[in-house]
């Protein structure tokens, strides 16, 4: 493997880096703001814009350097739900949205203990289970 394209979706920015696997050196990097949208049922991220950004720059990286593999990294509280066609079923919740806290008592009654999950109970949507609940 020579060049790995790394998709890194962070809270502030979405980034695409092309990394040489031998020396782990970034040879190309592009970023775009990860803006929280306020329309829809709750604060969420604009995934359509990210998709177009990544497609365009992956093609550019392929043309300029070649891409041998793609790796994705993101915050562990970031998820999307897909429908039977593979399309988004719901917008991707901003995991700092306090909406899940309004259902905290119900969720906490169902949530297994840390000794079972290995995951601490966190506020807002920082636990995927709280988002889905």
Feature locations, PLM:
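Short glycine-rich, Thr/Ser-proximal phosphate-binding strand/loop in the N-terminal lobe
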Residues: 3-47, 87-94
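Glycine-rich phosphate-binding/catalytic subdomain of phosphoryl-transfer
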Residues: 59-133
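N-terminal phosphate-binding loop and adjacent alpha-helix
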Residues: 29-66, 102-105
